[in-house]
């Protein structure tokens, strides 16, 4: 996955287009689509928020139908959430417009919106933009990955090639990483592998739990968060196990990229939990550590304050045996049933790097889980203190 | 409750003492006790953390026995959490030492520790301090309220007098207010009202849910969080309903004081939820708003970003009907089933004050709930980025 980003192309049969339609006040690219020339098997997971946006609600309905997909249209700048019936109509109109230009069914197009909540889409700009989008279709992935960004400081791509030549290309966006109620996160994966939709959908929730949700924490919880994988089968039959393992690798790579690009972040925070009673408890404990403002602040200050790990694990509700619990910071054991003597200055020095890793053994079982976050900086506050006004 | 703080005394039959025992490196007061000359009926609630500290575990055992209390001993500076068997022994020794000097049973003394997690108590200092504490017993409440502080910037007291002359005096500490895994919070109330212990214990959980837990969010979740009320009956029979209402008022006052003194806080954040399906959902929605770093950052910047309220409510899982939902900021309606036109500059100006209030109607029922938090400032990060090293 070291190929220079500008050269990454979508898998065969997929093309994408991006443009500046004027939705973002900045004039940056804000409207984009990915189109498949063949029907796609697909899997999807959307936010569990009770105030989910129109795009999530509509996609979920299409998902339930089980019918194949042909395209995805995304706008950035306006989330079209909490916009009532008008918002639902606008969202459907955005999909219909692309379907019409592509001459596919409107139910073959899913949508995704991200940006400020509570504003209606500027439909004149959206519709005239969508009308011209397909003229720009090309194989390159970077323009799409860039057009879906909001407060992200860099585009997020990950890709892999399977043994039969099939490829998986993933893109993601999301930067407000401090908490589940963050700015919207998307993760999309496109593949020319041929996979059975039932098998894909059966495996997808567990993959999402270990990747996308391991940065969102507490499940999918913004109004617009979503992740989807589209498989058009152009590369022919693909070993399912190999495919799913590779898909998880791409999703995991994207999840880490999102965490590392958290608003105001200077370091990636990785928490690896072992010795848990179940994978769910391991993931829950790891996520609770990654979302803790106290631990995140400590990581920012390169402070090996492992007491905050103990506290966050306790808060997560995961079963622990404190007397058998172990904690390491950057590989240095600091707690084993009780405080250990260690060189705090040296550990602090080792934390002044791009990634800080806490290993935590709960001492009760054999399940494991990993989650990612970022440090909390003063910059986070200044980014978010004045976003709309 | 406007009496100058230095003049507040404990209810009759209670006296307190505080001293600097050398537990805090700063040399500030860090060891204190409250003693009742009569047996106290009591109620208690401790953290639900799975890594609860020794003091919480021991108090819970005493609570289960139902036997009366005579004293509370508190140290600040070291939380004595994640300290294993040695920590449990030290905690019991601290209680035993005070019981011995007071000539009461060791099971009549509860303990509370707050400060850095994972350090053992300096028992030589604690024990020699406890030995001399009772020499300093006096009626004033402020020295005790001050000695239990850690990162608090001010002491927290609230008191009320009932119609029969009985009084309730409450003290609290807690400042790391951004999240449930905050630094430890205590709230203690002392009263000379005579109340039935069974009735008190029956009513206490709901009062805690509406007050103490409405700032801690997600229940009691630090390793050492606790709240307790001690009633020694010296003022004689008291109307139970009047007492419970007054107790809730004192606890609510303390909860707001804790929120307003959040680390780095410049404003109190109050979220009042109505129209919920249940009180639990109303409280959950209000708390989720108060803990949202995005909303807290917006409050810091005086940004009426009500979209973050919609998002936080959605994340809380509370039942909502978005088309019937209403949001007001500082009394100005900004959302009613969809975005409303309002003077954003004027509302922003009105947020530049000590308390910012969001009113949120979920549009599904008639239950209500209120929660308190504070804004998120860059100062929070600097306070917490370098706490132990």
UniProtKB/Swiss-Prot annotation, chains A, B:
Subcellular location: Cytoplasm
The reaction(s) this protein catalyses: N(2)-acetyl-L-ornithine + L-glutamate = N-acetyl-L-glutamate + L-ornithine; L-glutamate + acetyl-CoA = N-acetyl-L-glutamate + CoA + H(+)
Pfam families linked to this entry: ArgJ
Root EC class: transferase
Assembly and binders: Heterotetramer of two alpha and two beta chains.
Active site (catalytic residues): 184 (nucleophile)
This protein's name: Arginine biosynthesis bifunctional protein ArgJ
GO biological process terms on file: L-arginine biosynthetic process; ornithine biosynthetic process
Biological pathway: Amino-acid biosynthesis; L-arginine biosynthesis; L-ornithine and N-acetyl-L-glutamate from L-glutamate and N(2)-acetyl-L-ornithine (cyclic): step 1/1; Amino-acid biosynthesis; L-arginine biosynthesis; N(2)-acetyl-L-ornithine from L-glutamate: step 1/4
Domain of life of the organism encoding this protein: Bacteria
E.C. designation(s): 2.3.1.35, 2.3.1.1
Gene Ontology CC terms: cytoplasm
Family: Belongs to the ArgJ family.
Keyword set includes Signal: no
Signal sequence bounds: none
Keywords: Acyltransferase, Amino-acid biosynthesis, Arginine biosynthesis, Autocatalytic cleavage, Cytoplasm, Multifunctional enzyme, Transferase
Disulfide bonds: none
Database matches in InterPro entries: Arg_biosynth_ArgJ, ArgJ-like_dom_sf, ArgJ_beta_C
Binding site for substrate: 150, 173, 184, 263, 384, 389
Protein species of origin: Deinococcus radiodurans (strain ATCC 13939 / DSM 20539 / JCM 16871 / CCUG 27074 / LMG 4051 / NBRC 15346 / NCIMB 9279 / VKM B-1422 / R1)
